Curated annotation (Swiss-Prot):
Protein's name in the database: Aspartyl/glutamyl-tRNA(Asn/Gln) amidotransferase subunit B
Record bears the keyword Ribosomal protein: no
Classification of source organism: Bacteria, Pseudomonadati, Pseudomonadota, Alphaproteobacteria, Hyphomicrobiales
Catalytic activity: L-glutamyl-tRNA(Gln) + L-glutamine + ATP + H2O = L-glutaminyl-tRNA(Gln) + L-glutamate + ADP + phosphate + H(+); L-aspartyl-tRNA(Asn) + L-glutamine + ATP + H2O = L-asparaginyl-tRNA(Asn) + L-glutamate + ADP + phosphate + 2 H(+)
Top-level enzyme category: ligase
Quaternary data: Heterotrimer of A, B and C subunits.
Protein task: Allows the formation of correctly charged Asn-tRNA(Asn) or Gln-tRNA(Gln) through the transamidation of misacylated Asp-tRNA(Asn) or Glu-tRNA(Gln) in organisms which lack either or both of asparaginyl-tRNA or glutaminyl-tRNA synthetases. The reaction takes place in the presence of glutamine and ATP through an activated phospho-Asp-tRNA(Asn) or phospho-Glu-tRNA(Gln).
GN (gene name): gatB
Organism per entry: Methylorubrum extorquens (strain CM4 / NCIMB 13688) (Methylobacterium extorquens)
Enzyme Commission numbers on file: 6.3.5.-
């Protein structure tokens, strides 16, 4: 691809400007009821070693059997990434020793992965976007978990996670800033959640990132990269990249060289520290797993899975812009979570799309964020919010009263129309009543009347006073028209 250098994204060192080059390896836990090669449960949060089969524990004579649902989920993900689906792939043994890896090797895919090259379109602030290349996606087993805080002199191993299916999604080194990296992971997580192939819960370890970072002077060859392992939040991904890039720049500007190694990010200390020298592929002694035949399926299998895919974020965003007249920004906010997009569509159906988006984004999302709640936990249903939008559009209530009504529905529930009737919240459309209020305000403020003729912006003050006098129930358009006429403002 053509190299791009964005001056805004260069990092200023003590001597030079530097470009950071980032590639990502995302480990996404496959959404399935059982593990990749055994029937043990993948449920999170069980007692230690409660979800372990003889295969997971690597007991002698136990053979792996592929879980077809995990294969289907990997293919769906590949299709969602616009990637090449390989009809033949091979499982390999990746040999290394860890206490929580009972086999002494991990079953993974090396030369022949299930998914080949693809791409992800990533939206950035200020209307920019970049395309990040996907190098490959392969299936592999997760390892268990070592526990070091249970006893002062012993470590324990929990194999509940051992053998759980992971998709390792490897990007090309197309990212050039921590902001781009965060946006990429956010978009990838959104796609996975839409597809239903990974829940993307980083707190539970369902999505983990290995971040490859190198720096170079603009236009120069790629520098030596360091891999930061198992970063478990999008915020920490950004911090780890910034910290590691600064570390490398300081070494290079001091005349040193970067050692290729695996590092760990410590958010408490705000630093990366060395874990081990970075392994190369030959260190793992990959070879095809003799217990597993090559994985083969036909194009009809892929086509059947493709026909069942949901509408993905990019397509949904384009449709929202086209069908509802939304801005790219508003459409992007609404499609960021599938549940949010579904909620908006339910509100907007048969209504003014822009008005619906305004209420969903500004009022509903604003309140949800304030209270730390998710869209799934909203006390205001799409039907209730749609009714509020209808009441405004039909002129039954004003925008100000609508906000009061929203608060009532949020706190107490109920049918918005019935609440408006019961509490006398309908806006005043009787021009006689509005005119009486306007006349009273004009009569009480002769000095303001004179000022308004010279300074038309004072109209807003008169509108505010009229709305106050009518308890916010006066029709704003009628108030504006009457005041302009009586004050002689064009």
């Amino acid at each position: 691809m053509t190299e791009r250098v964005d001056p805004k994204k260069l990092i200023k060192g003590g001597l030079h400007d530097w470009e950071v080059v980032i590639g990502m390896e995302i480990h996404a836990q496959v959404t399935s009821r059982s593990k990749l090669f055994s029937g043990a449960s993948t449920e999170f949060g069980g007692e230690p070693n409660d979800h372990v089969s003889l295969v997971d524990a690597a007991m002698p004579g136990m053979l792996p059997v592929i879980n077809e649902e995990c294969v289907a989920q990997a293919v769906r993900t590949g299709l969602g990434l616009k990637a090449q689906i390989n009809l033949r792939s091979v499982f390999d043994r990746k040999n290394y020793f860890y206490p929580d890896l009972p086999q002494g090797y991990q079953i993974s895919q090396y030369k022949d992965p299930i998914v080949g090259e693809g791409e992800v379109l990533v939206d950035l602030p200020e209307g920019e976007s970049i395309t990040v290349g996907i190098e490959r996606l392969h299936l592999e087993q997760d390892a268990g978990k070592s526990l070091h805080d249970q006893d002062p002199t012993k470590s324990f191993v929990d194999l509940n996670r051992s053998g759980v299916a992971l998709m390792e999604i490897v990007s090309r080194p197309d990212l050039r800033s921590s902001e781009e990296a965060r946006a990429y992971v956010t978009k990838l997580r959104t796609i996975l959640r839409y597809l239903g192939t990974c829940d993307g819960d980083m707190e539970k370890g369902s999505l983990r990132a290995d971040v490859n970072v190198s720096v170079r002077r603009p236009g120069e060859p790629l520098g030596t990269r360091c891999e930061i392992k198992n970063v478990n939040s999008i915020r920490f991904i950004g911090q780890a990249i910034e910290t590691e890039a600064r570390r490398q720049i300081a070494i290079l500007e001091d005349g040193g060289k970067i050692d290729q190694e695996t590092r760990l990010y410590d958010p408490g200390k705000g630093e990366t520290r060395s874990m081990r020298s970075k392994e190369e592929a030959h260190d793992y002694r990959y070879f095809p797993d003799p217990d597993l035949l090559p994985l083969e399926f036909d194009q009809a299998y892929v086509d059947a899975l493709a026909s069942g895919l949901p509408e993905l974020p990019d397509a949904k965003k384009a449709r929202f812009i086209k069908d509802f007249g939304l801005s790219a920004y508003d459409a992007g906010v609404l499609v960021a979570e599938r549940a949010s997009a579904d909620y908006f569509e339910a509100v907007a159906r048969g209504r003014d799309g822009k008005a619906a988006a305004n209420w969903v984004i500004n009022e509903l999302f604003g309140r949800l964020n304030k209270e730390g709640r998710s869209i799934e936990d909203t006390p205001v249903s799409a039907e209730q919010l749609g009714t509020i939008v209808d009441l405004i559009g039909d002129g039954v209530i004003s925008g100000k009263i609508a906000k009061d009504l929203f608060e009532i529905v949020w706190s107490e529930g109920g049918d918005p129309r019935a609440i408006v009737e019961a509490r006398g919240m309908k806006q005043v459309t009787d021009t006689g009543a509005i005119e009486a209020a306007v006349d009273a305000i004009i009569a009480a403020n002769p000095d303001k009347v004179e000022q308004a003729k010279a300074k038309p912006t004072l109209l807003g003050w008169f509108v505010g006073q009229t709305m106050k006098a009518t308890g916010g129930k006066a029709n704003p358009a009628a108030v504006n028209a009457l005041l302009k006429d009586k004050l002689g403002i064009e």
